[in-house]
Structures are given as C-alpha cells and as structure tokens.
Amino acid sequence: MIKSSWRKIAMLAAAVPLLLASGALWASTDAIHQKLTDLEKRSGGRLGVALINTADNSQILYRGDERFAMCSTSKVMAAAAVLKQSESNKEVVNKRLEINAADLVVWSPITEKHLQSGMTLAELSAATLQYSDNTAMNLIIGYLGGPEKVTAFARSIGDATFRLDRTEPTLNTAIPGDERDTSTPLAMAESLRKLTLGDALGEQQRAQLVTWLKGNTTGGQSIRAGLPESWVVGDKTGAGDYGTTNDIAVIWPEDHAPLVLVTYFTQPQQDAKNRKEVLAAAAKIVTEGL
C-alpha cells in the first residue's frame, strides 16, 4: 500500500497511512494523496516522494519506503564524504587529481576542459553537484576508494538504506527490480537533512555543501519549477534509463523553517523520456498549502 502521511519522525512507522502529525495539516491529507495518485496515473510511471517539514519534523510520504535508482542524486553523498574528510584535514579539498582522456565518460562538461591542469577535490565536487559532471563523480569515487566507501559513509551518518554499487555512467541503468545504486525517498530525505541542516558535517563543511547545492544549474525544470520563485532552493538532479527522473532538494520558504524534499520517478519503458514536469508537479502538490 502506498504510504502518504504527515507524521512525526519519532512516531512508529506502523501508524495509519494518513496521519495528522501536528495540530493542523497544510492541506487535506486526502487531497494530497489523491493528487499524487492522479499525477502518478497520468504520468504512466512510478512516483516516490518524501517531504520533511523541519518546523515540526512532520513528513508526507508517497512510496516513501520503496527503492528507486538514485542516478546522479547519489553525487551528494560522494561530495559529502569528501567534505567529511576535510574536517580532520583541511587540505583534502585542495588535493589536485589528474584527469586523463581515458578517464572521460559521457557528460563531463567541466572535467573535459581540464585534461592538462587537473582539478582539486573541491572543484570536482562543485562540478559534479552543480553541473552533474560524471567524470568528476568517478574521480571522487576513485579517491574515496570505490563505491563501497560512499556507502560506508552513508552508514556512518545513520543511513542503512543507501547503496552505491557502480560508477558513472552504469549506475544510471535503473533496471526495474535491480537494487544496485538505489535508496528510498525517505532515507534520502533524512540523509539530506542530516548533511545540510543537521550535524553530520561540521559547520564549515555543511555550509560548503549548501552553497554548492544552491548553485546547481540543472534543476530549473524540476522541483524548483513547482515552487514560488521567492523560495530559495538547493538541489541535485538525476536521470537514467527507463525515463528515470530525480531531484532532491533543501528548500527555504519565506517565513518558514526549511523543507527537505525528495522526488523520484521512473517508467516501465527503457527508452522513455525524462519527465521533469512530474517532479515539478509533485513539488507543487506537497507544498501548495504551506
């Protein structure tokens, strides 16, 4: 059964599917559930949504505990792992890595310009988060010691769901039922909150991650498109086979505590086109009553 609920994080997961977590709902939970259901049916795919309202720790979930291919949204965890190392060694982010022609993979708009000069880990992190540069992601993974080290970092911050198994671009195959390189909307939302608003990173490192996310250049048609223009958004998009279209975001509405929103979407046809408008619509549905 699809879960679509407001609830306190501390409440038992077995609570009723549509549960009032605080004194009042932003909008009717029945209406939110129905709108997300209708959106999913119209889209012809499978939609996953997790929203955390940090004002009262309430949540709204739609397939929140189902696995989805993360695609490039996993880059947040990799960059955060680098930042974590810089807490004990500030020079880590200044370490320069060589970039060879053999390293380049599809969609590397930044790294392909630095074959002679190389790039620092800070520059690679910015490139992979703000331009979704795939070679930058692979170089970061290589520096960390492989995909399993990114997963180990996720475990260290309390995420038992995240798993990174491959590198770019194969981590984007998004084969239905394949658990490689997947997480759930709720697990990713909780981790994103810890990394950007919590204490999983030191203050300086947390601020740097937020700055990178706010400077993302690829999310204008996804979550951001479903929100008021005055709201500040830091996000990371992702895309893969089976029309997989993802976006994870930290949102700062006007006169309200931050929100954390994860939207994952995938389709049954391997060659299906990306559907960023579905993510924008989902973002509007879950925030329009705020």
From Swiss-Prot:
Recorded catalytic reaction(s): these are: a beta-lactam + H2O = a substituted beta-amino acid
Note the effect listed for D255N: In strain: D488
Q: Which residues does the Swiss-Prot or TrEMBL record annotate as the active site?
A: S72 (acyl-ester intermediate)
User: Which keywords does this chain's UniProt record carry?
Assistant: Antibiotic resistance, Hydrolase, Signal
| Signal peptide range in chain numbering | 1-27
Q: What is its EC number?
A: 3.5.2.6
Q: Which GO terms describe its molecular function?
A: beta-lactamase activity
Main EC class the enzyme belongs to: hydrolase
* Consequence recorded when altering D199N: In strain: D488 and HB60
InterPro entries documented for this protein? Beta-lactam/transpept-like, Beta-lactam_cat, Beta-lactam_class-A, Beta-lactam_class-A_AS
Q: What else is known?
A: In strain KH11 OXY-2 is known as OXY-2a. The class A beta-lactamase family has a specific amino-acid numbering system, sometimes called Ambler or ABL numbering and often misspelt as Amber. A multiple sequence alignment was used to derive a consensus sequence and then the consensus was numbered taking into account insertions and deletions. This allows use of identical numbers, e.g. for active site residues, despite differences in protein length. UniProt always uses natural numbering of residues, hence there appear to be differences in numbering between this entry and some papers.
Tell me the function of this protein: Hydrolyzes broad-spectrum beta-lactam antibiotics. Active against all third-generation cephalosporins but ceftazidime.
Kindly provide the name given to this protein in its UniProt entry.
Beta-lactamase OXY-2
Q: Give the gene name.
A: bla
